[in-house]
């Protein structure tokens, strides 16, 4: 039987109706600060917490409910005679329900506030109360989510009580919330610490997904509570719900186009680029990216690093695409794209922000810094030196190579990735794949060094004029010799770009 409830909420949504319901069921309401005033203004009988504690709030509201009269009433086990005798002797009444939602640290940490202003949104009293209530969930109902009000009211209406399973579930939500809340605070304070002793992640479920990589796998999307990253800053302008594979592919395509200051377009399928190009405008960039592999781009994702115009939109709707993502769309371009009702049109107003990459293995999580370093040096190791135009082309090809599964080879012509070979267990197969597709290519990029000179010799047969690779093989001299014999320039970067 519920007799007393403590209500202290930052988010006032639904609280007046909920409190009225409790009062009508004979429940005494205790409240604090702003919540007390809000309930009072809505003519709800309410007792201010200092009347219970006999102690006024202090330190600008930092200390309101941290008192034995509150926590004794929450933590006392009702069927423990000693507990009940102690609180009775101390004049403490049991508290049967705690309704609290926390200071909005998740939201405030994203805002452009001073450090100390953000600190003030770290809740202390609220977490202490809900943790106490959750520990004693058998005797105390704890609510932290406005979405749970209706279910609790239904149960009280029907049974005059809240059942054990619901109490347990609500208690579990408390510790789940607190783990994420504390992780967000920890990450904020340790933002300059690369690898803390304990890894605390703070993400909130933003959507349930239809399924995972395959239809028999369940999936959901959780977004970072710090507000950073692509998934926190997208606007879906058209199309159906994003899928698990859509999100993974979109992430890579977006990262590819933002490797470049020039106008860029990336076509991507199965987490691998199938066409990447720079262009004079978005239409030119799209046509060039499409030309790299007109077959594979079908059913894929297209990303741009500039606003999309109508002319480009009219080209894209000629084929089936899953997603088009760009910083913005002209209004007439959007009208054209919306003629494809299932095409997901995504506007994203932020560049990629990931600094770390996380991979899960059985029983562990692996964390590494993002592969953002391009080259320690651009060392020409051959007799022939690449031209300035070839250096630009080599840089382009290597940046595409970075996002291609290893072993990866990319061949390019005119800053168009005409041949992409990836995911091969040996480098020569990747080279053969890229070169066979990349007719007319003039430069070649490799994500790792050449263990033998076979790639150079094969490249020479296909008319390659310049090569970029990390270097570092014990047989580098063999590849250099083969380049010199075939009038090919080659540069070493000193940086490997494996992608597994």
UniProtKB/Swiss-Prot annotation:
Family: Belongs to the PurH family.
PROSITE patterns: MGS (PS51855)
Known catalytic reactions: (6R)-10-formyltetrahydrofolate + 5-amino-1-(5-phospho-beta-D-ribosyl)imidazole-4-carboxamide = 5-formamido-1-(5-phospho-D-ribosyl)imidazole-4-carboxamide + (6S)-5,6,7,8-tetrahydrofolate; IMP + H2O = 5-formamido-1-(5-phospho-D-ribosyl)imidazole-4-carboxamide
Protein name in the entry: Bifunctional purine biosynthesis protein PurH
Hydrolase in keyword set: yes
NCBIfam families on file: PRK00881.1, purH
UniProt-listed Gene3D superfamilies: 3.40.140.20, Methylglyoxal synthase-like domain (3.40.50.1380)
Domain notes: The IMP cyclohydrolase activity resides in the N-terminal region.
Annotated organism of origin: Clostridium novyi (strain NT)
GO molecular function per UniProt: IMP cyclohydrolase activity; phosphoribosylaminoimidazolecarboxamide formyltransferase activity
PANTHER family: BIFUNCTIONAL PURINE BIOSYNTHESIS PROTEIN ATIC, BIFUNCTIONAL PURINE BIOSYNTHESIS PROTEIN PURH
Any one Gene Ontology BP term: 'de novo' IMP biosynthetic process
